[in-house]
From Swiss-Prot:
Encoding gene (name): MT-CYB
Cell compartments where the protein resides: Mitochondrion inner membrane
Listed name of the protein: Cytochrome b
Residues binding a ubiquinone: 201
Membrane topology: Multi-pass membrane protein
Organism for this UniProt entry: Leptonychotes weddellii
Length: 379
């Protein structure tokens, strides 16, 4: 009798994706982040669903409904903090996943890579709209400042901003539509993730050496299911340590003050995972220029496959490129720090230098270094 998991139409898809999937035998822990992102997404959808049962998207009651969740709903506080800190874990995994792709040359799978960039944009949009929902000071002013950036678009900018707001300022209409989009987008992310996986399984996984691994494959289950479970346990442990011991570590104290359109906070800043892009935005004195730089800071990932000049796929055997990669990581950490600082000397200059360095590494130094390394190897 043929095994049902190999014949049943639905079970067959799951079997070919998670059980009998031929996987390179040498993929490291850096390949765990895909499954961790899946776990984060499921966790966010579930906690978000329970929060949505008690949340009201009205300017007069939004803040108090979040307070009500934390004070009166059974285990509401843990659901709320798991959702808030789950977003942080989501972005940590996302950035590590993208970093892995850059380091090991996974961007040569262009379809998978491009769907991944769309996923990144969608998750960022979801997180931004979610941050507006508690209707605290930083929610309100963050929404005002970021949506206002669209007014830099020539000719249609002002109309576009008012269309998004549903009025002449961030108000009830804005909050209601942000809640609607914040609810629906995670399901769009789920669908895109399935497409991401579909394209990945067309080519098979990359591996640390960058060499085709068709001659050395092992089944996904049990080897990588066990490995992924270990990763998941470490993820949940980290998340719960954050939630139970310092749930507000990554948040902003200003968001515990109800939104007040008449009082601007001294330092308006987004959540920590957007600070690097915010620093790039602020480092350009011109509004339109800043908005373009902000968009390009992520869109630049789309042209990385075109800038691949090395004869090797990954950076495993390319020490000079490795140095540049870690310089890029340090630069992004610097930008993240600068994004959270006030706009004054010396932070402005540091931010501008770090922004220039970010684009220079990706657009100029990495392709040139790859050519130099090719010549060193005399290939």
């Amino acid at each position: 009798m043929t095994n049902i998991r190999k014949t049943h139409p639905l079970a067959k898809i799951i079997n070919n994706s998670f059980i009998d999937l031929p996987t390179p035998s040498n993929i490291s822990a850096w390949w765990n982040f895909g499954s961790l992102l899946g776990i984060c997404l499921i966790l966010q959808i579930l906690t978000g669903l329970f929060l949505a049962m008690h949340y009201t998207s009205d300017t007069t009651t939004a803040f108090s409904s979040v307070t009500h969740i934390c004070r009166d709903v059974n285990y509401g506080w843990i659901i709320r903090y798991m959702h808030a800190n789950g977003a942080s874990m989501f972005f940590i995994c996302l950035y590590m996943h993208v970093g892995r792709g850059l380091y090991y040359g996974s961007y040569t799978f262009t379809e998978t890579w491009n769907i991944g960039i769309i996923l990144l944009f969608t998750v960022m949009a979801t997180a931004f709209m979610g941050y507006v929902l508690p209707w605290g000071q930083m929610s309100f002013w963050g929404a005002t400042v970021i949506t206002n950036l669209l007014s830099a678009i020539p000719y249609i900018g002002t109309d576009l901003v008012q269309w998004i707001w549903g009025g002449f300022s961030v108000d009830k209409a804005t909050l209601t539509r942000f809640f609607a989009f914040h609810f629906i987008l995670p399901f769009v992310v789920s669908a895109l993730a399935a497409v991401h996986l579909l394209f990945l399984h067309e080519t098979g996984s990359n591996n640390p050496s960058g060499i085709p691994s068709d001659s050395d494959k092992i089944p996904f289950h049990p080897y990588y299911t066990i490995k992924d479970i270990l990763g998941a346990l470490l993820l949940i442990l980290t998340l719960m340590l954050l939630v139970l011991f310092s749930p507000d570590l990554l948040g902003d104290p200003d968001n515990y003050t109800p939104a007040n359109p008449l009082s601007t906070p001294p330092h308006i800043k987004p959540e920590w995972y957007f600070l690097f892009a915010y620093a790039i935005l602020r480092s350009i004195p011109n509004k339109l220029g800043g908005v373009l730089a902000l968009a390009l800071s992520i869109l630049i990932l789309a042209i990385i496959p075109l800038l691949h000049t090395s004869k090797q796929r990954g950076m495993m055997f390319r020490p000079i490129s490795q140095c540049l990669f870690w310089l890029l990581v340090a630069d992004l950490l610097t930008l993240t720090w600068i994004g959270g600082q006030p706009v004054e000397h010396p932070y402005i200059t540091i931010g501008q230098l770090a922004s220039i360095l970010y684009f220079t590494i990706l657009l100029v130094l990495m392709p040139i270094t790859s050519i130099i390394e090719n010549n060193i190897l005399k290939w």
